[in-house]
Amino acid sequence: MANTLVGRKRIRKFFGKIREVAEMPNLIEVQKASYDQFLMVDEPEGGRPDEGLQSVFKSVFPISDFSSTALLEFVKYTFEAPKYDVDECRQRGITFAAPLKVTLRLIVFDVDPDTGAKSVKDIKEQDVYMGDMPLMTENGTFIVNGTERVIVSQMHRSPGVFFDHDKGKTHSSGKLLFAARIIPYRGSWLDVEFDAKDIVYARIDRKRKIPVTSLLFALGLDGEEILSTFYNRITYARDGRDWRVPYDAERLKGFKATTDLIDADSGEVVLEAGKKLTARAARQIAEKGTKALRATDEDLVGQYIAEDMVNYKTGEIYAEAGDEISEKLLKGLSDVGIEEIPVLDIDHVNVGPYIRNTLAVDKNSAREGALFDIYRVMRPGEPPTLDTAEAMFHSLFFDAERYDLSAVGRVKMNMRLDLDAPDTMRTLRREDMLAVVKALVDLRDGKGEIDDIDHLGNRRVRSVGELMENQYRLGLLRMERAIKERMSSVDIDTVMPQDLINAKPAAAAVREFFGSSQLSQFMDQTNPLSEVTHKRRLSALGPGGLTRERAGFEVRDVHPTHYGRICPIETPEGPNIGLINSLATFARVNKYGFIETPFRRVRGGVVTDEVVYLSAMEEAKYYVAQASAAMDAERRLTEDLVVCRRAGEVIVVAPDRVDLMDVSPKQLVSVAAALIPFLENDDANRALMGSNMQRQAVPLVRADAPFVGTGMEAVVARDSGAAIAARRAGVIDQVDATRIVIRATEETDPTKPGVDIYRLQKFQRSNQSTCITQKPLVRVGEVVKKGDIIADGPSTEFGELALGRNVLVAFMPWNGYNFEDSILLSERIVKDDVFTSIHIEEFEVMARDTKLGPEEITRDIPNVSEEALKNLDEAGIVYIGAEVHAGDILVGKITPKGESPMTPEEKLLRAIFGEKASDVRDTSLRVPPGVTGTIVEVRVFNRHGVDKDERAQAIEREEIERLAKDRDDEQAILDRNTYARLADVLVGQSPVAGPKGFKKDTLLTREVLADYPRSQWWQFAVVDDRMMTEIEAMQKQYDESKKRLEQRFLDKVEKLQRGDELPPGVMKMVKVFVAVKRKIQPGDKMAGRHGNKGVVSRIVPIEDMPFLEDGTHADIVLNPLGVPSRMNVGQILETHLGWAAAGLGRQVAQAVDAYLRNQDAQPLREQMSRIYSPSELEGLSDRELAEVGNNLRRGVPMATPVFNGAKEADIEAMLEMAGLDRSGQSTLYDGRTGEPFDRKVTVGYIYMLKLHHLVDDKIHARSIGPYSLVTQQPLGGKAQFGGQRFGEMEVWALEAYGAAYTLQEMLTVKSDDVAGRTKVYEAIVRGDDTFEAGIPESFNVLVKEMRSLGLNVELISSKRAANDQLEAPPEAAE
């Protein structure tokens, strides 16, 4: 550990007992590998293999026109460099993509009108631009329109053939109806199924079913062939009055005789009636020499004839294949002298008559009728002809354009049906269909097993590359139609490939996929862990997948094959449970899309270090031991019986039968679950909540790695890209808050610059508005190796994930303030900013060109006081660093308001005399309610050709200065390195020539060289040719590097000065970023890592909190009743171990202080070696040891890996070493009375997270605001600045109190009575406090809805009704 840079700063004590052999793969490999394989940007030697983008082009091209006189071929594709880099795309709100250029070849043929022979007339090649292809960033994300998105991998049913039954649900008798389904990667599905009468049917694409024999007829078989394919035949030969039937021991074993079995030759009884023929007896009968048995006419009746019985002379058909033999038929056959009758071997026990019965009910008996039937099912209403029917049937399953099993489908099919087709055979064959029907019939006969569709051998993962490939193929196919039409309509001799191609459909398909596909998601960027988990997510939803509503329990359930592949713990709560999963830590996806997990080989009971990755199908054959199986020093399995897994069962076997062993105990859980210490002591439901809530932890102002971790923290920080790792080994040259400059020392490849500049992100906004800020960990002069962490990012500390803070917890009730999971906090936590986080809100405003004239961003706003403009600069944009509150102006903007459009003359007069104020309204960007903060960044975007204002120019100048500084620093290091190398070459030489004033043959020393300016050193010439070429090469390389540097700088400046690409109609856009500091307050949600969540109920003054004997106050008080029923005891063990860690930290701190006083490192070394193993400390100098010790003052960090961590005894040992009570409990004193509590209390350090559910984002108030247009009721929700709904139950409450007038107000003038609202306003203005409520608008809406149902409802007010009564004529009144 001590050999890494961070390891020299802080060491984690490791409790794991099991050595891990396999290297954990990079956590975002799933994304990166998949997309790289799809794009294949760098063309390998010998051209690209046929996969990814290459295969898409290969499958669509060549395209020929309808008359086949021209052919458009695909040659190759290349990517150009992307126009903007990742950061520029993020800032400008555009997509990070590279232009795709495709080389196409157009071949025009001459067709001889007489012979039809073709000859090449013309060949044209050209590069065609085919739109931009989004590129993946280093961290496995895509930048689409300036936001980071992730493409989630999809789990779907693997192509291939599946056998299943309906579990007895279809038929009332509960009979199992078997079915087979052939699922291609794309194309028509074919189902073959039994019905309740045991007839076999086929259906194509879930359409109407047809007898399976019709399908077989369509494949070109006839009835006799069908029967001979599915059944064996037995020939009965006439033997006097009886028949002889050949004796077959295999066929008859297990047969129960109803009559005596008699040997046809000798006449002896070989088996008496009522007895069962065992396998042994059957064998003995054959050994005795029995060749045939005797059979009577009765035995033949009821059997089925195996082939057509025909009189070849007359052509008369006596019986057809499949006919049942009746006594009459048998007599008829005997009469015409037939001596041998071949029958089908159907015994109704081992072999059923299903296919024969299907053949009997099938109306068709030849190919033509069957094809017509299939055509009518697929295209009802169209009259079939033989040609169209044949073509349609061929295109369904045998046309590679329409039907693709994919390599996976073919491999799975071969495995399931024991076929041997090559995996390039992607369509179905006749043999495949026959094999499927045969396997289905065997299932019905009780042979074989049905498939488990939730087995991971039958589900595969489609990652980014493959999803993108399918999408692009769709785009190209749309394009293909257009190309064909264009080829036919233009003069083909004169056009170039460019003219035939419109790349819009392809580009649109890509855009649509990244912009609106269900699997393209807005990246969860709350903290580094949530980024990593989002990229490792597997979703069963999405196009071609399941839907939430239809997914049953089985699909969602944990399956034995998930072990080491999919995490059984991490999945969302709610409707998506089990449909969205997470990849396990060591899992990877193989080329076929199946998830593999690593194992160690075990040979003869000895565990080796050889690691193999196996998919679920391959694993089923082996006995797999657990990683925790006991071994001796020679790695021999020591127990007599080892617990193993095999094919989903857990069994015990002898050590020498074990084949494999898990590589690590944490290989079965996901990254988030592997971050929970003592996971093995938590209930699974709570662990699920714990994994999910860690992803919602907000990065705090001061990160603090957990005292009790699991050792995964560093891995997550590194792979998430939050912490910066050194790209090459080198020496730190410069460090400040915004960048780190490293002078590279490893292989200085002449083409690469000898310096790496790492820009640190400062106060950037994440997708979730949390704050991304990085800070350096290194000092000038430190040596770093490749991969060392040189800067911390959000939620990382010393290169380890740090999602929360270690706080001193006491488990005890406190005045009911921690009832029902509430959390009581000490004021110290607020005062010391323990749980303070920074959130960055982004506000943007656009100045558009309206019909009435352009909007303008300005400081000159009508009717606004100077006070309100105090934070704006002369361009009308807020200053950086200004503190703003709700309602403050961020960007001043005025919009022309038109009574009427102006004539050109009026426009001219306006322009000359500038009468503005009268006809503009204030549409400034203001701070929304509930936001208070500091402006941290302002970005101004101008359209091409629009003059930049002062603010935009100032921002541009700053940016150019920064770029120039980078260039100058890189140049300085380049100079220093190059001239140092040149000096090394020249010193000790006696040049024959040199700069002006140099005497020939003078011996060069460093002093002599120092007399000449460095730029003149190149003029020295030495005799040695080899040395001269070296100097020349050095100079050439130096000049090129210099030129490259300057060019890069100029490119960036040119990009800055160029206008921005804004949406149509927008002249100018300003983005303002406000940083909001959120301290913790009552109502915020907090959680530990064990699913122990709660809401802060009260923040208590420090002096009132319970305190320990040494006067230390607890930071947080949790309710002990939250533990037993939830069964997440991990939090208690974590508290104890954290308590020990803090105690050891105090001891180390004392030793460090003693060392600093008297410079004797021995006591410090002894203290440290009590805690750590010697190997962890070797190679540390005294000064480094003191630095490590200094970083342990607050507590010694420990790692207790999941299923392999500290046991109770280890915790007690640590507590003892720290000089604390072994029980982990302490006497606490009441902060208010100073008296000790009656019983000891569990006190220790627990790691708490502040979650993204902050009360500030939820609290909301409104007096007057927007109303809905239709119902005129106030809108709802904080985002719309809506009101609170006064619902049914609230109405009951007011009714119960009899508060009639309050209720009337609520339902009318405070809600949707439009006239009443204005009256109230007028009354308030007049100072009057009486008003009248009218009819609520929603009542009118209800009336309109009733009218739309055809009920004519009229409203008659009660006064009017009374008047009508009075005015009624007297006779009507009578």
Curated annotation (Swiss-Prot):
<dbReference type="InterPro" id="IPR010243">
    <property type="entry name" value="RNA_pol_bsu_bac"/>
</dbReference>
<dbReference type="InterPro" id="IPR007120">
    <property type="entry name" value="DNA-dir_RNAP_su2_dom"/>
</dbReference>
<dbReference type="GO" id="GO:0003899">
    <property type="term" value="F:DNA-directed RNA polymerase activity"/>
</dbReference>
<dbReference type="InterPro" id="IPR019462">
    <property type="entry name" value="DNA-dir_RNA_pol_bsu_external_1"/>
</dbReference>
<keyword id="KW-0808">Transferase</keyword>
<dbReference type="InterPro" id="IPR037034">
    <property type="entry name" value="RNA_pol_Rpb2_2_sf"/>
</dbReference>
<dbReference type="Pfam" id="PF04563">
    <property type="entry name" value="RNA_pol_Rpb2_1"/>
</dbReference>
<dbReference type="InterPro" id="IPR007642">
    <property type="entry name" value="RNA_pol_Rpb2_2"/>
</dbReference>
<dbReference type="GO" id="GO:0000428">
    <property type="term" value="C:DNA-directed RNA polymerase complex"/>
</dbReference>
<keyword id="KW-0548">Nucleotidyltransferase</keyword>
<dbReference type="InterPro" id="IPR007644">
    <property type="entry name" value="RNA_pol_bsu_protrusion"/>
</dbReference>
<dbReference type="Pfam" id="PF10385">
    <property type="entry name" value="RNA_pol_Rpb2_45"/>
</dbReference>
<dbReference type="Pfam" id="PF04565">
    <property type="entry name" value="RNA_pol_Rpb2_3"/>
</dbReference>
<dbReference type="GO" id="GO:0003677">
    <property type="term" value="F:DNA binding"/>
</dbReference>
<dbReference type="InterPro" id="IPR037033">
    <property type="entry name" value="DNA-dir_RNAP_su2_hyb_sf"/>
</dbReference>
<keyword id="KW-0804">Transcription</keyword>
<comment type="function">
    <text>DNA-dependent RNA polymerase catalyzes the transcription of DNA into RNA using the four ribonucleoside triphosphates as substrates.</text>
</comment>
<dbReference type="InterPro" id="IPR042107">
    <property type="entry name" value="DNA-dir_RNA_pol_bsu_ext_1_sf"/>
</dbReference>
<dbReference type="Pfam" id="PF04561">
    <property type="entry name" value="RNA_pol_Rpb2_2"/>
</dbReference>
<dbReference type="Pfam" id="PF00562">
    <property type="entry name" value="RNA_pol_Rpb2_6"/>
</dbReference>
<dbReference type="GO" id="GO:0006351">
    <property type="term" value="P:DNA-templated transcription"/>
</dbReference>
<comment type="similarity">
    <text>Belongs to the RNA polymerase beta chain family.</text>
</comment>
<dbReference type="InterPro" id="IPR007641">
    <property type="entry name" value="RNA_pol_Rpb2_7"/>
</dbReference>
<dbReference type="Pfam" id="PF04560">
    <property type="entry name" value="RNA_pol_Rpb2_7"/>
</dbReference>
<dbReference type="InterPro" id="IPR007645">
    <property type="entry name" value="RNA_pol_Rpb2_3"/>
</dbReference>
<dbReference type="InterPro" id="IPR015712">
    <property type="entry name" value="DNA-dir_RNA_pol_su2"/>
</dbReference>
<dbReference type="GO" id="GO:0032549">
    <property type="term" value="F:ribonucleoside binding"/>
</dbReference>
<comment type="subunit">
    <text>The RNAP catalytic core consists of 2 alpha, 1 beta, 1 beta' and 1 omega subunit. When a sigma factor is associated with the core the holoenzyme is formed, which can initiate transcription.</text>
</comment>
<protein>
    <recommendedName>
        <fullName>DNA-directed RNA polymerase subunit beta</fullName>
        <ecNumber>2.7.7.6</ecNumber>
    </recommendedName>
</protein>
<dbReference type="InterPro" id="IPR014724">
    <property type="entry name" value="RNA_pol_RPB2_OB-fold"/>
</dbReference>
<keyword id="KW-0240">DNA-directed RNA polymerase</keyword>
<dbReference type="InterPro" id="IPR007121">
    <property type="entry name" value="RNA_pol_bsu_CS"/>
</dbReference>
